[in-house]
Design a protein with these regions (language model features):
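Short beta-alpha junction loops
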Residues: 128-130
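A short, conserved, highly charged catalytic patch centered on acidic carboxylates
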Residues: 1-122, 133-233
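Acidic beta-strand-to-loop metal/phosphate-binding motif
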Residues: 124-126
Length: 233
């Protein structure tokens, strides 16, 4: 095989290529169902009609089969509107509200309670148009932390399409993608950044820079006090 034959070989697809293709597929599928979503919203649908539309999105946009969409699940007195089980593995609990109904964090309690008992790490609160994904933690007590929120009403840009892809059958089976997004959110949280800034190693660096640039020797405690007083107030 010469250089010409080698050049003709298809470049091996990277994970980024695969994910980009899946995001484009999500955009295409969503565009197909968007007119129906707009039409239904104008009719002030009830909860039953809202569920039917959510079913369509789960199947036609997110790629779940009927057998992977389990409804009205119960376990030890805890209930879930939906449990998504790609490949038969329970992966996401959904609390579904009527289209356009206001969403509040406390509404996710039932889904997170079910998820915690069933060993599921992700719970979704949605009114079909707005989607809020939570990570369920059970270390000391059951807690639900918001990972991201989506508004589908105006269509999908690249970022929202990627996040919707993470909730699709292909996305949620790659559980490391949601984990990665969650770790990034935690790393960039105010609590994490403050802890990093006030770390002894960072304070040492700041002390050295201030000595070099300003010519005044300071202690780490003096620097920490000033940061807390002047920067983090």
């Amino acid at each position: 095989t010469g250089p010409e034959a080698t050049g003709k070989r298809r470049r091996r697809r990277t994970l980024q290529d695969v994910l980009a293709a899946q995001v484009e597929e999500i955009k295409t599928r969503y565009r197909a169902i968007q007119p129906l979503l707009k039409r239904v919203m104008q009719d002030s649908p009830n909860e039953s009609q809202s569920r039917l539309l959510l079913d369509r999105i789960l199947q036609d946009v997110l790629g779940y089969s009927l057998s992977e969409i389990k409804t009205e699940q119960k376990i030890q007195g805890r209930a879930a509107d939906y449990v998504l089980a790609p490949g038969g593995v329970d992966a996401l609990v959904i609390e579904a509200k009527r289209i356009g109904a206001p969403l509040r964090d406390k509404q996710i309690f039932q889904a997170t309670s079910y998820a915690a008992y069933a060993g599921i790490r992700w719970a979704l609160l949605t009114n079909v148009v707005n989607w809020q994904l939570y990570r369920v933690a059970t270390e000391d007590k059951v807690e639900a932390d918001l990972v991201f929120a989506l508004d589908l009403q105006g269509g999908l840009d690249g970022d929202s399409a990627y996040r919707l892809m993470l909730l699709s059958k292909t996305g949620i089976t790659r559980c490391e993608l949601l984990d990665k997004l969650w770790r990034k959110k935690v790393a960039l949280s105010q609590e994490s950044l403050i802890a990093a800034i006030l770390n002894e190693e960072v304070l040492n660096k700041i002390r050295a820079v201030l000595l070099r640039e300003r010519g005044y020797p300071l202690t780490n405690q003096e620097i920490q006090d000033a940061i807390e007083r002047e920067v983090l107030r």
